[in-house]
Amino acid sequence: MTEKMQQKLSDSKVARWSVLALVAFTMLTGYILTDVMSPLKPMLEEQLGWNSTEYGFFTSAYGWFNVFLFMLIIGGIILDKMGVRFTGLASCVLMIIGCGIKYWAISDAFSMEGELFGWKAQVMVAALGYALFGVGVETAGITVSKIIVRWFKGKEMALAMGLEMATARLGTAMALSITVPFATYFQSIAAPILLCLIMLCIGLITFLVFCVMDRKLDASAGADEEEAEEPFRLKDILVIVTSKGFWLIALLCVLFYSAVFPFLKYATDLMVNKYNVDPELAGNIPAILPFGTILLTPFFGNLYDRKGKGATIMMYGALMLIGVHLLFTLPILNEWWFATIVMIVLGIAFSLVPSAMWPSVPKIIPEKQLGTAYAMIFWVQNIGLSMVPLLIGWILDTYCKVDNGTGKIAYDYTLPMAVFTGFGILALFIALLLKHEDKRKGYGLELPNIKG
C-alpha cells in the first residue's frame, strides 16, 4: 500500500509559507495606518491647531471599543466559534471603514465645527474612526495568530510568528519614515491616510486569496483540523482565566507593549525636542526600531523553535527595555547619533520579547480556546495602548512645556521617559515570575517548539 507523503495541505512548505505571506501582508497594511499619525504630530499642532492632550486623546481611541465595549474579547469568541475566514474578512472590512472615517475627518472635505462630546469635532470624529479601525486590526491580529498555529503547529511556528511580526513592523517603519515626506509632497496631512486606505483594500484582496487556500486545507486528505462552528461555552473562558501562566503572559504583554508602542507615538516628537533633529527627518530614527525587528524577530523566533529558552528570552528583552528608556531619560549626549544607537538597542529588545511571548501562549492554553485567549491578552494590552498615550499627552501639556526661544511649542521629555522606564522594570519582574511559574507547572516555555 502506498503511504501518502502529505496528508494535509499545511504539510507542504510552499503552501504554508504562501499562506503566511498573504496574511502577513494584510497585517502590514493595518500597521501602516496604526502609526501613520505619529510623525504628523508637529504638523497637526501647526496646521490644524491640535495640542498634545488632543493628540493623546486621539491616539488613545485605538483601544476604546476593544477595552470598554469588550469588542476584542467578543471578536475572540467569534473567532473560536466561526473560524478564521469569517472573522478575518469581517476584520478587514472594519479596518477599511475606520480608515475611511479617519481620512474624512483629517481631509479638507471635513466641515464640522465646534465641539463633539467635549472635544473638537475633528479630533472626536478622527478618534471614532481610529477606534473602529482598532477593533478591526486587533481582531485581525488574533485571527492571524490562530491561522499561524493552525498551519504551523509542530513545525516552524515561532519562526512564522516572528516573520509575521517582522512584516507588521515593516508597516510601522513605513509609517514612520515616509509619512511626512508624502504629506509634504502632496501638501496634505490627509494624503498618507488615503494611501493607507488604498493599501487596506489590497490587504482585503490578499486575505480573500488566503481564504481559498484555507478551504483547500479543510478539503485536503486527512485534514483532521477542519474548521467547524463550535458553540460558545463559559467553561472555555474559565479554563483561561484560572491559568496563572496566562495572566503572567497578559501582564508582561501590556507592560512591555505600553513601553514601546505609546513611546513610538511620541518618538518623532522626542527626536525633535531633545535631540534637535529636523522634523522632516526625525521619523527616520524611530523607524530604525521596526527595521531592526524585521531581521531579528524571525532570528529569535527560529532560535526559540530549535533551542527553546522562551522565558529566558523574554527576561533579557525586558532588561534591555529598561536600559534603553533610562538612557532616553537621562540628560546626556543629546545628539542624533546617540539616539540612533539607543533606538537600535530598543529594536533588539522589541525583537526578543514578542518572538518568545506569542508562541508561548499555545503551550499554556489548549488550541480550541486559543482565539479567546489571544483576544483576552490583546484586550489587556489595549488597556495600556489606550491609557498610556493619553497619560503621556497629559504629562507633556501639564508639566513638560518649555520655552526654547523660537515661539514654537517645545517639550522636555524627561518625565514621560521615566514613566516608560517604570513600565520596563515592572515587565522584568513579571518575566521573572513567569519563568518561575514555568518551572513549577512545566509549560515547556524553555523547550524547543519543533518536535522531534
Where are the model-predicted features located?
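Helix-loop-helix hairpin linking two adjacent transmembrane segments in secondary transporters
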Residues: E164-R215
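C-terminal ends and interior cores of transmembrane alpha-helices
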Residues: V93-G118, L319-L333
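Extracytoplasmic gate region of multi-pass secondary transporters
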Residues: M37-K41, S243-T297, P354, V388-P389
